[in-house]
């Protein structure tokens, strides 16, 4: 869903392990790394989209995680001009609802090949703040906002 301003509705997932390290995935056939994320389909709530993306991208089901928190606001970022879709509807960026999850199941349940079009080639656990300086530059500010917002929920 792309709104009138050109922003695609999207959910992003920060998945914690027991040591409060976060899941960090390498995009398929690319050198870039990021958190799991994906679009909100028409008629879908952000929570429903989050669970769908969680399964599509890393193979986890609702029973494998605990939802700790979600952002109140949608965080927006613009994409570089070279990535802007010029066909209707024009997409200039994404607005994201963020979710903080805790992994309850063994990490062996993480399955990057859970669907026919995997999003990630590789993954690892990284320290909580690591992603801010290692995600693609145009996402850094939304990562900073989300991780700062969630910090109060981490024991």
From Swiss-Prot:
A motif (Nudix box) lies at residues 38-59. PROSITE patterns: NUDIX, NUDIX_BOX. GO terms for molecular function: bis(5'-adenosyl)-pentaphosphatase activity; guanosine-3',5'-bis(diphosphate) 3'-diphosphatase activity. Its EC number is 3.6.1.-. InterPro entries: Nudix_hydrolase, NUDIX_hydrolase-like_dom_sf, NUDIX_hydrolase_CS, NUDIX_hydrolase_dom, RppH. SUPFAM superfamilies: Nudix. Belongs to the Nudix hydrolase family. RppH subfamily. Accelerates the degradation of transcripts by removing pyrophosphate from the 5'-end of triphosphorylated RNA, leading to a more labile monophosphorylated state that can stimulate subsequent ribonuclease cleavage. This is RNA pyrophosphohydrolase. The gene is rppH.
């Amino acid at each position: 869903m792309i709104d009138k301003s050109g922003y695609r509705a999207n959910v992003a997932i920060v998945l914690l392990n027991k040591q409060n390290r976060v899941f960090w995935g390498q995009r398929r056939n690319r050198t870039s790394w990021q958190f799991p994320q994906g679009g909100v389909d028409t008629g879908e709530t952000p929570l429903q989209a989050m669970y769908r993306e969680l399964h599509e991208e890393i193979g986890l089901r609702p029973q494998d995680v605990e939802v700790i928190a979600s952002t109140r606001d949608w965080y927006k970022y613009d994409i570089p001009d070279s990535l802007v879709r010029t066909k209707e509807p024009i997409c200039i960026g994404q607005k994201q609802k963020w979710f903080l999850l805790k992994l309850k199941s063994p990490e062996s349940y993480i399955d990057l090949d859970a669907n026919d079009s995997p999003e990630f080639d590789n993954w690892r656990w990284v320290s909580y703040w690591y992603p801010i300086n290692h995600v693609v530059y145009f996402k850094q500010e939304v990562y900073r906002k989300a991780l700062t917002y969630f910090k109060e929920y981490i024991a």
